[in-house]
Each structure stands twice: as structure tokens, then as C-alpha cells.
Swiss-Prot record:
<feature type="binding site">
    <location>
        <position position="46"/>
    </location>
    <ligand>
        <name>substrate</name>
    </ligand>
</feature>
<keyword id="KW-0460">Magnesium</keyword>
<dbReference type="InterPro" id="IPR001980">
    <property type="entry name" value="PPAT"/>
</dbReference>
<feature type="binding site">
    <location>
        <position position="103"/>
    </location>
    <ligand>
        <name>ATP</name>
    </ligand>
</feature>
<keyword id="KW-0548">Nucleotidyltransferase</keyword>
<dbReference type="GO" id="GO:0004595">
    <property type="term" value="F:pantetheine-phosphate adenylyltransferase activity"/>
</dbReference>
<feature type="binding site">
    <location>
        <position position="22"/>
    </location>
    <ligand>
        <name>ATP</name>
    </ligand>
</feature>
<dbReference type="Pfam" id="PF01467">
    <property type="entry name" value="CTP_transf_like"/>
</dbReference>
<comment type="pathway">
    <text>Cofactor biosynthesis; coenzyme A biosynthesis; CoA from (R)-pantothenate: step 4/5.</text>
</comment>
<comment type="function">
    <text>Reversibly transfers an adenylyl group from ATP to 4'-phosphopantetheine, yielding dephospho-CoA (dPCoA) and pyrophosphate.</text>
</comment>
<dbReference type="InterPro" id="IPR004821">
    <property type="entry name" value="Cyt_trans-like"/>
</dbReference>
<dbReference type="InterPro" id="IPR014729">
    <property type="entry name" value="Rossmann-like_a/b/a_fold"/>
</dbReference>
<feature type="binding site">
    <location>
        <begin position="128"/>
        <end position="134"/>
    </location>
    <ligand>
        <name>ATP</name>
    </ligand>
</feature>
<feature type="binding site">
    <location>
        <position position="92"/>
    </location>
    <ligand>
        <name>substrate</name>
    </ligand>
</feature>
<feature type="site" description="Transition state stabilizer">
    <location>
        <position position="22"/>
    </location>
</feature>
<dbReference type="GO" id="GO:0005737">
    <property type="term" value="C:cytoplasm"/>
</dbReference>
<dbReference type="GO" id="GO:0005524">
    <property type="term" value="F:ATP binding"/>
</dbReference>
């Protein structure tokens, strides 16, 4: 009998905002999984620029025609959410050794909490190694051009947020 189980990965994060680095990880992961759920964290301990609704909306807009990608928000323990979705894989992107240190510790804790769940790491494409949501927000807040680092819909949302006080964010 043929195994028809869907290979599902959960890609968690705050995505504040979604960057082209995140998108690259998702597109590459689509070669490994049948379905990817982008799980937007509500209570990550960070103070987001965008509300949970705004972040989910930006990601939904980016992936609106992609049947392999779903977007949901979640709160609480990631492993509880992963179990609820009947998934066995957490997907994470790595840019640098510093990312690995944190992600390694987190994956070990997740494994301790739920041994059936594996964490898969994808190394960021070299074009996006230096890009993070934090860097994008910092550059945008200072009026810098972030056109190359985020999808157009996110660029517009950043402009809206930051142009309330500044009007020099470049949009091409």
C-alpha cells in the first residue's frame, strides 16, 4: 500500500515583517514538504511593530495563490501547536553561527518536550545572510531603501507605518 501521508512542516516565527530571506526558505522547503504552515507567533516575548493580524495579512497576501502554503497564528508552546496540527517537523532558517546557537538550544528543548517532533534547519541563501526583520525595520525606520529585502506588499506596510512620522522611505 502506498504511503499517502502528507509531509507537513511548521515554519514558526514572528515575521515582523516577512522578508525575502523568509520567502527563500519557504520556497526551498516546498521541495522537501507537501505543505508548509507559516505559524505566526502571537506571544514571542518580542514587541512587534505590526499586530498579529497585520503580520498574518502580509504573509497571506504574499502567498495568496500558493496551495502549498497556509498561514495561521498561534500562541503558547510551539510543540503543542505542532502536535495539534499533526505535524512532525519544525522548519527553521539559519543565517549565521549565532542563529544556530539559539536554534540548537530551542530544538533540544522542543525534543525534550515532544520527542516525536524533529527540527529541520535550512541555511539561508547567501543573498539573504545579512537580512533579518530587525535590520529591515531599522533601515526602514531611518528612511533607507528596503525594496530589495521585502515583497512589495510588505514594503507598502512598512511605508505606512514609518511614513506617519517620515515621508522619505523609498518605494520603486
Amino acid at each position: 500500500m502506498e504511503d499517502t501521508k502528507i509531509r507537513l512542516a511548521i515554519y514558526p516565527g514572528t515575521f515582523d515583517p516577512l522578508t525575502n530571506g523568509h520567502i527563500s526558505i519557504i520556497h526551498r522547503a516546498k521541495h522537501l514538504f507537501d505543505k508548509i504552515i507559516i505559524a505566526v507567533a502571537q506571544d514571542s516575548g518580542k514587541k512587534p511593530l505590526f499586530s498579529i493580524e497585520e503580520r498574518v495579512s502580509m504573509i497571506n497576501t504574499t502567498f495568496f495563490s500558493d496551495h502549498m502554503v497556509d498561514v495561521e497564528n498561534f500562541s503558547g508552546l510551539l510543540v503543542d501547536y505542532v502536535e495539534k496540527k499533526n505535524a512532525k517537523t519544525i522548519l527553521r532558517g539559519l543565517r549565521a553561527v549565532s542563529d544556530f546557537e539559539y536554534e540548537f538550544q530551542t530544538s533540544l528543548m522542543n525534543r525534550k518536550l515532544c520527542p516525536e517532533i524533529e527540527t529541520i534547519f535550512l541555511i539561508s541563501d547567501y543573498k539573504w545572510l545579512y537580512i533579518s526583520s530587525t535590520v529591515v525595520k531599522t533601515v526602514a525606520s531611518l528612511g533607507g531603501d528596503v525594496t530589495d529585502f521585502v515583497p512589495e506588499n510588505v514594503l507598502i506596510c512598512l511605508k505606512t507605518k514609518y511614513c506617519q512620522s517620515k515621508s522619505n522611505l523609498v518605494i520603486t
